[in-house]
């Protein structure tokens, strides 16, 4: 999934090894950079049903639901545009490169995706691809945290590329303390979230960047244009969302970046989440529930 992971377990230390193996399994199934992954098979399927692992069935269901529930403000079909813009190679392993057919489309609804749970197959609409992106990170954190708790961990905190899921007893009076860093100065803490059992995800225009003809590019694309969001005084550069699950915190952090404060915070409030938006010019805006979790 093109990110690093940090895992904290309160309980049997051997569960750290379990978490590592499980995250590696999800990486092998979900990465767009690994040619043998389920995602790569789906992205080359051309409308044919593909047998995938049940983990991938779960992932695809979330991707389809996220696109629908956010009115396509979160759009996992933008991979062809992202690759064309120069983000084909993995940032964590430069030997891994996304390979796509040049005739693929983006920005189309996934509603026609066929998911056969009984036979564990997925059929994507012809011409569309999937990029698990941030949703995959959040879902992986949720799944592994839940599984470690079922295996006896008293408390778990899993962080994958800025998506964090905390479950069970934390080290600070039973809670988990999560700092939110400034997008401008990494050592500066904007807020500290206190979570008993929940998730926090941060999405930023600076999380993944690269150069094309000496022009800086980033990975957060407009679902309308397929191009990186433009930096301006009114543009949000970083969005942090707190909720029950990392998967949805990540989805709606992306929504805030893409849609802006008016539409983004409307969706945040409707979903019962909390958010902090930081603008390019340094201004900050909190949603109504933000102070309930932070100091």
Locate the predicted segments by residue:
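Mature catalytic core of soluble alpha/beta enzymes
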Residues: 1-295
């Amino acid at each position: 999934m093109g990110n690093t992971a940090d895992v904290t377990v309160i309980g049997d230390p051997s569960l750290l090894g379990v978490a590592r193996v499980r995250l590696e399994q999800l990486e092998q199934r979900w990465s767009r950079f690994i040619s043998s992954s389920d995602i790569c098979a789906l992205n080359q399927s051309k409308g044919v049903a593909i047998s995938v692992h049940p983990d991938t069935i779960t992932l695809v269901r979330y991707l389809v639901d996220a696109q629908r529930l956010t009115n396509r403000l979160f759009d996992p079909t933008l991979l062809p545009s992202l690759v064309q813009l120069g983000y084909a190679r993995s940032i964590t392993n430069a030997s891994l490169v996304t390979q796509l057919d040049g005739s693929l489309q983006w920005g189309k609804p996934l509603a026609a995706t066929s998911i056969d749970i009984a036979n564990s197959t997925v059929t994507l609409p012809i011409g569309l691809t999937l990029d698990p992106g941030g949703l995959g990170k959040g879902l992986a954190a949720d799944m592994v945290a839940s599984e470690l708790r079922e295996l006896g961990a008293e408390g778990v905190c899993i962080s994958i590329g800025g998506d964090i899921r905390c479950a069970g007893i934390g080290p600070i009076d039973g809670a988990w303390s999560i700092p939110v860093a400034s997008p401008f100065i990494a050592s500066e803490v904007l807020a500290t979230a206190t979570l008993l059992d929940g998730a926090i995800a941060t999405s930023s225009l600076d999380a993944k960047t690269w150069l094309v003809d000496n022009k800086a590019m980033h990975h957060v694309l407009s679902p309308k244009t397929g191009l990186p969001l433009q930096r301006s005084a009114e543009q949000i550069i970083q969005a942090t969302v707190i909720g029950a699950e990392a998967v949805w915190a990540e989805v709606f952090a992306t929504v805030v970046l893409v849609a802006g404060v008016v539409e983004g915070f409307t969706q945040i409030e409707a979903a019962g989440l909390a958010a902090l938006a930081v603008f390019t010019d340094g201004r900050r805006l909190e949603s109504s529930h933000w102070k309930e979790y932070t100091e």
